[in-house]
A protein has these predicted regions:
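Alpha-helical transmembrane segments and their helix-helix packing motifs
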Residues: 2-196
């Protein structure tokens, strides 16, 4: 008997469901991807705002608190059933390797999902800007974090992104295995804690 056969089949069935949604309701799929991008942006905004406040207060465990805070972003995505590119890398690749979904369909879904995530993130950033946030010390903190994240070489950024994506995929896999919503949330928090 193969370990985790049922869970792996659930992942493949989820991939087929994602493809069906994309094929039957492309606008609905794109909207779901936009929502995921907005949730990740919202989680990032809350995390970095919190980081700004804690850093200014001289907190010595700012990074630990920020890690737990950012886990809220993926929690929102998973619990709402939104379409996130990084999680879909695992789901769609698994189904493609099992030949449940074609690689061409997987690539199509990845492109649409990535674009939807990007558009959702940009819209939320625009809303933050129009709302006057972030500004002052918080805005400066955001700029410092962004500069630090983009300060590496292209290969360094690529491999860091790959490692982060592995942890998101692990969180998605753990959510497949967990039988309760609380179990899913706990595993998301642990995977994203490592990520940060």
């Amino acid at each position: 008997m193969i370990m985790f056969r049922d869970e792996f089949n659930s992942v493949c069935n989820a991939a087929k469901g994602k493809m069906a949604l994309l094929n039957n309701n492309p606008a609905g799929y794109f909207m779901s991807a936009m929502v995921a991008g907005a949730f990740i942006t919202l989680g990032g905004f809350v995390t970095f705002t919190l980081g700004s406040i804690l850093t200014a207060a001289g907190c010595t465990i700012t990074k630990v608190i920020m890690a737990f805070s950012f886990a809220s972003a993926l929690s929102l995505v998973v619990m709402a059933g939104a379409e996130l590119f990084t999680g879909n890398n695992f789901v769609m690749a698994a189904a493609s390797f099992k030949k449940e979904v074609s690689w061409l369909d997987t690539l199509k879904l990845w492109v649409v999902c990535y674009l939807g995530n990007f558009v959702g993130a940009v819209i939320l950033v625009a809303l933050f800007q129009l709302g006057g946030v972030p500004k002052g010390a918080t805005g400066e903190y955001f700029a410092t974090i962004a500069a630090g994240k983009m300060g590496g070489t292209a290969s360094t950024l690529f491999f860091k992104g790959m490692l982060c994506n592995m942890l998101v995929c692990l969180a998605v896999w753990c959510c497949t295995k967990m039988k309760t919503e609380s179990g899913k949330l706990i595993m998301i928090f642990w995977c994203i804690y490592i990520f940060m």
